[in-house]
Structure formats: C-alpha cells, structure tokens
C-alpha cells in the first residue's frame, strides 16, 4: 500500500503537465468564485460606484446687478434665458478621433438650433460678410491681439514667421486664420458648408480657451427657444457634453440714448482676464464683464459673487448627485444721477435738429460751387444718394448674391461697366511711358490714386516707417507734382516697399520687374475692394449710370425701409422722384443723420444741476444699440459701427473737442476783470478791424461796427473787437508779450476747469487751452479745444458765481436688500472768489441779454441767460455751440450744446431752448420731443459769431 501511494506521488510530481493543470484548475475555481461575488453578491454596489465615476466642482454665475436712473427707472437689467452649452467630457484615442467626434456633435446641434430659428453665438474676431467672405472685426492693436491669441502667444511681440504653417503670424489674413482653424487645428470636415465650418471652428476655439480649466462649459447659443431646449433634453445621451443652462441675458432700455453712458457687457478678453485675475482668481475666460461705460467702471459692484457646487455625473454625463452647494450672490444695483426721461428726450430733439439742418441745406443738384462763407455751403442731393452707398446704408455686396433682386442686378450691371472702364484706365496709367502728374489728373482719378496709395501704406506694402519725409520725390508726391507711377517706382528703388507682398522672388529682381509685379498686384488687389468699389459708385452716381431713385427703391428691397410696394415700384420705374423721397425719409427720420454721415451728423448736450453739480443729462448723437453688443456680440453690427463715418462709438459729449468760439468770452471777461486790464465800466470802441497785431483780425460785424461797449454789452453782442483788445491787454504790462497773455488766459481757464477732465466715470478727453496768440485765444479761437462736458461745467461755474464741481454720473450703489453700500455724487472742486458781485453781475447781465436777443427764447416761460459760439473749420460748415443756464435770477440748471458742422450757433441755441423746455416741463417742448415731427431750422435773433 505504501509503495502504491509513493508511486502515485512520484507520478503527480514528476508530470509537469499534470502540475500545471492542477494550478489552472485551482485558479479557475478562485476566479469563478470572485466573479460570483462581484456580479451576484455585490453587483449592485459596484454598479453604483461605477455610476459615480466623475466628481467635479462647478461655478454658478451670479446675476448681474441692474442700473437705474436717479428716479429708479431701470436702464439695464437681466432676463432669464436658456443657453445651449458644451463641455468636452468625452474620451478619445487620438486628436483625430476627438476632432471627428466633436465636429459631428456640433454639426448636429448647430443644424437643429438654426432650423429652430435660433442663432449661434459668434462673438469672434472674424465674421462672414454679406459677400460670403471672411473679414476681420477689429483693426490695429486689437487685431494683433486677436492674432496673438489665435497662435497661442501671450504677447503681440511674440508673433513671428510660423515655419509649420508657412505664414507670417503678424500678417495672417482672415482666410489664413480660418484655414488654420478649420483644417490644421480642428480638422473640420470639408464636406460641411462654409458657414457651418466657421461656426464649428468658433465654438471649438472658445472651448479650447478653457482647456486648462476643468469643467468649464462653452456657450453654443444664447437665449434659445423652447423647441431647442426640448431637442437638447431629449437627445442628451447622444450629444456628449451638450447641455441646457439657465443664464441671464443683459437688456437695455432706450439703448441708443444711453449707450454712451451705460456701455455694454461682453465676454472677457485675454488681456482683461490677465489683468482682472491678478486680484480675483474666480475669473474664467468664459466670464461676462463690463466692456464700456458704467458697465465697465462699476463691474466690481455689478458682477456679484459666483457660487459653486460639487456634482457627480455618470459616464455619459447624467447628473447623479449635487453636494456642497453655495448660492451665488447677486450683483449690486447702481443708480445714476441722470434723469432718464430728460436724457431720452434730449437725444430725440438733438436728432431732429440735425435732420432739420440737413433739410435746410440739401439742394437738388449734382454738385455745388465752393464758397468762402461757411453758412453758404449747401449739400447736393447727389451727395445724399452716394451716402446711401458710401456709409453702407445699402449693402452693395448683396447685389451679386443669388437672392439679389432684379433691380439690384441692374445696378450691379451698370456698376460693372463703369468699373471695367476705371480698371482699364488705371492699368494704362500705371504702365504709361508718359504718366500724368497727380495734380493734372481729374478729381475722379485723383481720388482713386489717393485711395490706392493710402491702402498700400495701411497694409504695409509701402512701409510708412521707412519713408524719408525730407526726400525730394516724397515732397513732390505730397505737393501733387509727381505721378503715381513715379512715386511707386521710387518707393521700390528706396526699399520703402515690402516686395514679399506681391512677389515670391526676393533676389536678383530689377526695379522694372518689381514695378510691373506691383502694378499687376494693384489691379488685382483693388478689383475686389469694397472701399474702392464705393469710390467707383460715387462717380457712377454722378454720371447717372446709377440713379438716385434706384438706390431709394433698393432700401425697400434690403429692409432698410419698411416695405411699401407701391412706393418702391414707383421709385424703381421712375414715377416718383428721388429728391422729394429722400427728403421725406430724412424728415420722418426713417433715414437718420447718423446713417447718412453728412455734415452735420453728430452733436451733444450736457445738462447740470447748478445747485448740486449733479449731471442730469449727458447726450451724444448718434448712439448705438447696446443690446446687439452685449451677451453674444453681433460681430457684423460691431463692424458696421466701427466703419460708420458718423462714429457712433465715439462719445461726442465727453470726447469731441473743438474750439469753443465765443462761448469762451466769459472766461476772457473774467481774466480781464480780475487782472484789472478792464473794469465793468471800461468802454472799448469797436473799429471793425483790429490792427494791433499782424494778422489784423476783424470783428464778425465788419465792415460795420458795434461802437463803444462795456464788458456786459460786449458779451451781449459777442463783439470780437472788444475781446481782441482784452487779449492784447492781458499780454501787455511792459510791452506786448504773447506768452504773458496766454499764461493769464490759461490761469483763469484752469480755475474754471477748462483744461482738466471733469471727473466722470466714463471715457473722457482732456480739454486743452490755447498755447499761442492771446488776441485770437480771447475769442475762443487759436488752438483752444474743449469738450462739451467741460463747457457745461464751465457755464455751471459761471451760473453759480464761481463753484466748480468734480462731476459724477453716479448717485449710489445698493445691495439686493435696498441698503445703500456706497454713496457717489459731485464734489465741490473749487470756489472761485476772484470777482466781486458787480463783476459777476456784468457777466450774467451780458448773457441774459444774449438770450433776450434770440427769438428762440421769445415767450419762453423761464428767463434764460446764455452765450452762442461758432468754431470755424476751413472748407466745412462751422461748429455750432450754445451754453446757458436758467432761471436767470436763481439758476437751477446749466447746459452746453454742440452740433459739429452745425453751420450757425443759432441752431444750437434753438434746440437748447427745447432742452430747457423739457427740463422745466414746457408742454410744447415735451410734445415735440415725443412726436415724429421734424421741423425745419430758422434763423434766430441778431447775434452772429
């Protein structure tokens, strides 16, 4: 028996196969047992642990605070809306797989969003224009910052030649960048339409900005419909990472009237993020911040404080559990000093006055003769027709689109014929052996030549910084004595040209070959240039190849005007004349001065409470619609604002500076009285022509005379001669000294705050006081340049006999419980105590007499004191100004009004009467402000300055 067992043992141990089989069997039994435990005994527990695979912490955006006027009228608020978002929560084997998966998901989502009538967010530095071409939104430094962001550089200076992409990053075109994004970076299938590839690229780029910040969702579309919400919710399991979020959409009331004050919000830029995150690490590159105006200045109060929560999601993104929830804190509310009703009505009245001036000056002519007298300048109606094209009221690029109307196609055909002639002529000019010098060209071809050379410089084909301004040929070009050929050829010879822009050859190329290449480049480059096309249109209109009635009819076709089939067809077939029609459009303001960008097209008014220094109105015209810039910025609208020749993004109330004209004479009177070069009783005889200085300036009344006047009468009649003498005397004292006179004028301008910013919280330019010619400076000319808001503070100081305020647009900030957490408001900067009551009285009396002489203030219920002013501009209509206050005996409000190129100060005075009327509750002024009526302007009173 023992031997038997020993043999069995020897057999088992000696067989390797048997031993291995034994081991495998043992392990198999263990594995089966373990699987039984995992799947049967503890399967439910492990499944739960699998589902709770991802833990992430999310930020919860705070609701932005609202902005109110002084009376609690809401100007900026929030509406709850649904947004489609995407978070890259997928797992991929490679970048190629990732690009393919995301492209498919985004294609699906974008298609459904658009089919539901919703818009994709496209706040991006490139947009697709109406011709279907890629175009940059910004220019200059902003464009370079965008390029740096695209190519992953922290600084603009890091832009370089990219050997991998074979392009100069600093000069990458919109097409270059979109090719890089769609093809090389994100691998978006070429089978998709251009608009779809663009939309996917924009979303992918925005997603990529947050690659280092986990669990930050990117918005695909804001403020979507319930239909889109339902689609996303129903298909969420297939649309990995796509979700619906509740977001606040910023909305603005009466935005055009308030845009310059309130500004708008937008997505934080790289530079803004880098700056703001230094002090607050809760910022992300998806955040919305104030981008301009009070929204920007008060962002830290309006923004609120983000909340947070920890969420657990399963492998497909389904929410399993939420923990550690912290509610966001709503932003604080900001209250302004501005009276919303007054602001809105002043804006309306200002637009009406400018429209009225246009109606007075438009004449039924192609051109008008040049005149030496600014008030005689008229506007030929053909300039109005061209303005429809030149300022992009009509989109000429739509004429070549498949859905262009027959009338648009007719106009395009006429234009094409004209353009062919122009390009052929330019080609001959550039290759001529006997080129014509610039001054001998027709005005038409001078304009083309100027445009081409300027554009070549703007695009760094001709290198501005290389040009020697003292070079003889450069001087010949500047003085119009050189031909375009000679100038461009010389630029090549002097290495003032970047030849890589038009040739791939860089060595062993002679000047003739380079010139021929550049000439060919010019013809090719300007055959597809919207600005150059507009110049051609200008001449096509003058030659009646394109007619005014056609352009007016096309405004109906393109939706610029509300559809009226009968009127549209009457214009199209010539049964209705364009001249009367366009005048009716201006009168009804269905076409506004801001759209036409003729002279005048802009203006401003600032009104201040003289007793407190509070800003009541700060109006600039034209404004813009903040709603189209906030939230998901409409890039095409932003571009239209930047290219609009009336400059709606520019605040004329706080930034525009012109000579103050005769409104400065109260400052000169103060200087003269305080320095004792005159007294209130001093009589100066107006001799018409002032011969004590070499330029022999004349009084505006010359060859007549005002006779003998004191300072109050000189203000009343705006006598230039009187104030020439004051300026001369200020420069006296031991012999005439120009610097002494300027120094004394500057001293009192400084006391009145005319050479400083006023303290408001939005962008403001600093006014400047004359640095030469005290005789001319004393009447507000020389190189005086003062903003409207500085003039308003100045006249407030005069009305209050010397109180100069530091201004503020703000009143207070309060939290959600209504508790005031910070007070704002004006502060007394200076009390000027240099004049006695009699001297102030003389200035006030003169201003009262000005208003009494103006028919604008006839039968006005409140006594007004004021001063008109005219700032002269060579070869243009004069700027029109008026400053004043009321009531005369006990001032409550002061104002300054400026209409750039407004012809005569009477126009500024006329509309200022209505501004004051609205403030004092005058029913006629309020009714006019609220009506659709536009009245023609009238000559008012006898003052001319």
Regions inferred by a protein language model and the residue ranges of each:
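Membrane-proximal periplasmic segments of bacterial cell-envelope enzymes
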Residues: 2-586, 595-604, 610, 727, ...
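Penicillin-recognizing serine hydrolase domain
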Residues: 417-526, 685-711, 736-789, 799-821, ...
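Second-shell loop/turn segments in exported
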Residues: 54-56, 86-99, 214-222, 282-285, ...
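Short, glycine/proline-biased beta-turn/loop segments that scaffold the active-site neighborhood
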Residues: 371, 619-621, 629-632, 658-712, ...
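Conserved catalytic neighborhood of penicillin-recognizing serine enzymes
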Residues: 332-333, 377-427, 431, 649-651, ...
């Amino acid at each position: 028996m023992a031997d038997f067992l020993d043999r069995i043992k020897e057999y088992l141990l000696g067989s390797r196969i048997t031993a291995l089989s034994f081991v495998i069997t043992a392990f198999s039994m263990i594995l089966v047992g373990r699987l039984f435990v995992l799947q049967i005994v503890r399967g439910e527990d492990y499944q739960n642990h699998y589902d709770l695979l991802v833990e992430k912490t999310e930020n919860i955006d705070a609701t932005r605070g609202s902005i109110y006027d002084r009376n609690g009228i809401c100007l900026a608020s929030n509406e709850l809306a649904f947004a489609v978002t995407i978070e890259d929560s997928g797992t991929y084997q490679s970048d190629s797989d990732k690009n393919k998966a995301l492209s498919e998901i985004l294609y699906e989502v974008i298609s459904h969003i658009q089919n539901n009538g919703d818009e994709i967010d496209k706040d991006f530095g490139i947009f697709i224009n109406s011709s279907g071409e890629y175009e940059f939104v910004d220019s200059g430094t902003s464009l370079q910052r965008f390029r740096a962001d695209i190519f992953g550089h922290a600084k603009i200076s890091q832009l370089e030649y990219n050997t991998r992409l074979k392009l100069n990053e600093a000069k990458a075109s919109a097409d270059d960048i979109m090719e890089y994004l769609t093809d090389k970076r994100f691998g978006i299938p070429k089978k998709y339409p251009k608009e779809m590839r663009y939309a996917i690229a924009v979303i992918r780029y925005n997603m990529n900005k947050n690659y280092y910040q986990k669990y930050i969702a990117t918005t695909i579309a804001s403020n979507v419909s319930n239909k889109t919400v339902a689609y996303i919710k129903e298909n969420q399991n297939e649309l990995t990472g796509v979700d619906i979020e509740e977001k606040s959409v910023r909305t603005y009331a009466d935005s055009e009237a308030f845009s310059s004050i309130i500004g708008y919000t937008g997505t934080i830029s790289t530079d803004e993020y880098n700056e703001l995150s230094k002090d607050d690490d809760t910022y992300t590159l998806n955040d919305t911040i104030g981008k301009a105006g009070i929204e920007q200045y008060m962002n830290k109060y309006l923004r609120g404080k983000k909340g947070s929560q920890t969420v657990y999601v399963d492998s497909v993104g389904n929410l399993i559990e939420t923990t550690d929830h912290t509610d966001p804190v709503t932003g604080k509310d900001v209250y302004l000093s501005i009276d919303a009703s007054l602001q809105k009505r002043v804006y309306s009245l200002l637009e009406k006055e400018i429209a009225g001036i246009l109606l007075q000056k438009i004449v039924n002519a192609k051109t008008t003769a040049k005149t030496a007298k600014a008030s005689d300048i008229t506007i030929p109606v053909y300039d109005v027709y061209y303005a429809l094209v030149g300022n992009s009221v009509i989109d000429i690029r739509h004429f070549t689109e498949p859905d262009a109307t027959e009338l648009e196609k007719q106009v395009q055909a006429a234009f094409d014929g004209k353009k062919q002639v122009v390009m052929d002529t330019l080609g001959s000019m550039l290759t001529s052996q006997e080129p014509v010098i610039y001054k001998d060209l027709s005005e038409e071809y001078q304009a083309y030549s100027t445009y081409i050379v300027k554009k070549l410089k703007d695009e760094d084909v001709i290198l501005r910084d290389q040009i020697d301004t003292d070079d003889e040929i450069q001087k010949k070009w500047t003085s119009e004595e050189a031909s375009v050929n000679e100038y461009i050829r010389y630029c090549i010879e002097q290495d003032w040209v970047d030849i890589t822009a038009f040739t791939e050859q860089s060595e062993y190329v002679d000047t003739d070959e380079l010139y021929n290449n550049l000439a060919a480049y010019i013809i090719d480059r300007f055959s597809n240039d919207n600005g150059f096309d507009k110049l051609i249109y200008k001449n096509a209109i003058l030659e009646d190849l394109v007619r005014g009635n056609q352009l007016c009819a096309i405004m109906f076709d393109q939706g610029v005007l509300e559809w009226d089939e009968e009127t549209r067809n009457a214009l199209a077939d010539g049964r209705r004349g364009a001249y009367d029609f366009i005048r009716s459009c201006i009168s009804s303001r269905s076409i506004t001065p801001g759209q036409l960008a003729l002279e005048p097209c802009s203006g401003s008014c600032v009104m201040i409470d003289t007793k407190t220094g509070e800003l009541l109105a700060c109006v600039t015209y034209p404004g813009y619609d903040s709603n189209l810039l906030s939230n998901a910025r409409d890039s095409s609208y932003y571009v239209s604002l930047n290219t609009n020749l009336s400059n709606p993004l520019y605040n004329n109330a706080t930034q525009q500076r012109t000579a103050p004209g005769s409104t400065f004479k109260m400052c000169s009177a103060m200087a003269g009285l305080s320095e004792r070069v005159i007294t209130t009783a001093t009589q100066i005889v107006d001799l018409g022509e002032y011969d004590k200085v070499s330029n022999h300036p004349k009084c505006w009344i010359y060859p007549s005379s005002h006779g003998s006047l004191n300072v109050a009468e000189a203000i009343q009649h705006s006598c230039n001669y009187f104030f020439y003498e004051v300026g001369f005397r200020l420069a006296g004292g031991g012999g005439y000294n120009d610097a002494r006179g300027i120094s004394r004028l500057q001293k009192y301008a400084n006391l009145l705050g005319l050479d400083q910013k006023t303290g408001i919280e939005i962008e403001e330019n600093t006014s400047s006081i004359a640095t030469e010619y005290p005789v001319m400076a004393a009447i507000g000319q020389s190189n005086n340049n003062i903003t409207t808001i500085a003039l308003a503070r100045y006249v407030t100081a005069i009305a209050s006999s010397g109180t100069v305020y530091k201004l503020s647009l703000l009143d207070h900030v309060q939290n959600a419980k209504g508790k005031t957490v910070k007070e704002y408001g004006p502060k007394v900067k200076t009390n000027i105590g240099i004049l006695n009551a009699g001297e102030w009285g003389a200035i006030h009396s003169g201003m009262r007499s000005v208003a009494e002489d103006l028919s604008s203030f006839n039968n006005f219920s409140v006594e007004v004191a004021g001063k008109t002013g005219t700032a002269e501009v060579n070869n243009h209509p004069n700027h029109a100004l008026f400053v004043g206050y009321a009531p005369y005996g006990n001032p409550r409000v002061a104002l300054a009004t400026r209409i750039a190129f407004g012809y005569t100060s009477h126009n500024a005075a006329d509309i200022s009467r209505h501004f004051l009327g609205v403030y004092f509750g005058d029913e006629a002024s309020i009714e006019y402000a609220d009506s659709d009526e536009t009245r023609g302007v009238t000559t008012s009173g006898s003052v001319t300055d």
